Amino acid sequence: MSKAGGNDSKSTLYCSFCGKSQHEVRKLIAGPTVFICDECVELCMDIIREESKSSLVKSRDGVPTPKEIRRVLDDYVIGQDFAKKVLSVAVHNHYKRLAHAAKHNDVELAKSNILLIGPTGSGKTLLAQTLARILDVPFTMADATTLTEAGYVGEDVENIILKLLQASDYNVERAQRGIVYIDEIDKISRKSDNPSITRDVSGEGVQQALLKIMEGTVASVPPQGGRKHPQQEFLQVDTTNILFICGGAFAGLERIISARGKGTSIGFGATVQAPDDRRTGEIFRNVEPEDLLKFGLIPEFVGRLPVLATLEDLDEIALKRILQEPKNALVKQYQRLFEMENVDLTFQEEALTLVARKAIERKTGARGLRSILESILLETMYDLPGLDSVEQVVIGPEVVDGKARPLYIHGDRSKDAPASVSA
């Protein structure tokens, strides 16, 4: 590998693909008779990644196998094997339903909507976002916390179908074969077990409104959002073949599950129950529909979600893998940012272990990793553009603990020293 160097125009090397000189690129790789720059290598990798996606959706008459879907999910999501299998099978069956409906009409295959339950930061939303990358059907994500009953301030449930239409460029036929992910579904649980004279417009009312579109109905969707344009023409969208995936953290559900089956008594003969010391993800494995009813979901809504997948808590090992292994791993992202300043960013193994421990202490799962790294690298990213001689930045465990500054390695290796910025 040859780096840019030398000012003699006769000895200047050029990339054989894009024509840039060795002075215009970071690195130039030499072959027997040709050269290729780092930018062209990146472009080639992007092309290969796109082709691998297209080969996925063309296998077996356009129906990707569960293993193929799982393989792509593994590239971005660490752990959660059970949830990946459930999603892979569900999406595979969704494709098969669509193919079957187009060829046969003797047996009607019903869809199986999915409910994902897992602690915060366990990867529910990331799984859905990763599915969106690999599917050849329209995909949209909605937030249940913004939904209200029709006629109240907030979004109507029909807006979910509108987003799916927008994702399909208003092609109704394609939208009717799409997949919808509704996040924060636990936030629309019934606010109380007892009926109330006041309407629960963002809880049970939204569940009631979602029932029809999840089961299958012809929804009238205003293409511009109905409330501000009441006179517009409505589009008719059949939701029968739209797959719905719902996800939520369901905070407090673990207590309902743990309490199930434990007899309660008072007085001298009462049985003292030991506290359940299992992790939240372990408790979620034993969830039953009756637990969801006690949590606040109405029976009809639970019945529309026959497939249930639970996600595990992420332990220290999994969080370290999340930092380093996926294609969009946080460490790789920050290393790329530093490469733009011609600086190599290195994390010591003990430092990554401490970052994972901090995320566990905060109980934010993988979602908390970015904020931890941002706080660690803030001063360095602020100072780096003005430091021309720095070639490498090393993050050790003391930096994560806030007891030291990152180690700056300058172009002159004899100048290895901590950052010159004062505390």
Swiss-Prot record:
SUPFAM superfamilies: Glucocorticoid receptor-like (DNA-binding domain) (SSF57716), P-loop containing nucleoside triphosphate hydrolases (SSF52540)
Residues annotated to bind ATP: P119, T120, G121, S122, G123, K124, T125, L126
Domain of life according to the entry: Bacteria
Keywords: ATP-binding, Chaperone, Metal-binding, Nucleotide-binding, Zinc
Record: residues binding Zn(2+): C15, C18, C37, C40
Disulfide bonds: none
Domain ClpX-type ZB: 3-56
One cellular-component annotation, GO: HslUV protease complex
Chaperone among keywords: yes
Gene Ontology biological process terms, A to Z: cell division; proteolysis involved in protein catabolic process
Molecular function terms from GO: ATP binding; ATP hydrolysis activity; ATP-dependent protein folding chaperone; protein dimerization activity; unfolded protein binding; zinc ion binding
CDD domains associated with the record: RecA-like_ClpX
KW Zinc (keyword) present: yes
Family (UniProt): Belongs to the ClpX chaperone family.
UniProt cross-references to NCBIfam families, sorted A to Z: clpX (TIGR00382), PRK05342.1 (NF003745)
HAMAP family linked to this entry: ClpX (MF_00175)
PANTHER family, sorted: ATP-DEPENDENT CLP PROTEASE ATP-BINDING SUBUNIT CLPX-LIKE, MITOCHONDRIAL (PTHR48102:SF7), ATP-DEPENDENT CLP PROTEASE ATP-BINDING SUBUNIT CLPX-LIKE, MITOCHONDRIAL-RELATED (PTHR48102)
Quaternary state and interactors: Component of the ClpX-ClpP complex. Forms a hexameric ring that, in the presence of ATP, binds to fourteen ClpP subunits assembled into a disk-like structure with a central cavity, resembling the structure of eukaryotic proteasomes.
Its job: ATP-dependent specificity component of the Clp protease. It directs the protease to specific substrates. Can perform chaperone functions in the absence of ClpP.
The protein's name in its UniProt record: ATP-dependent Clp protease ATP-binding subunit ClpX
UniProt lineage: Bacteria, Pseudomonadati, Pseudomonadota, Alphaproteobacteria, Hyphomicrobiales
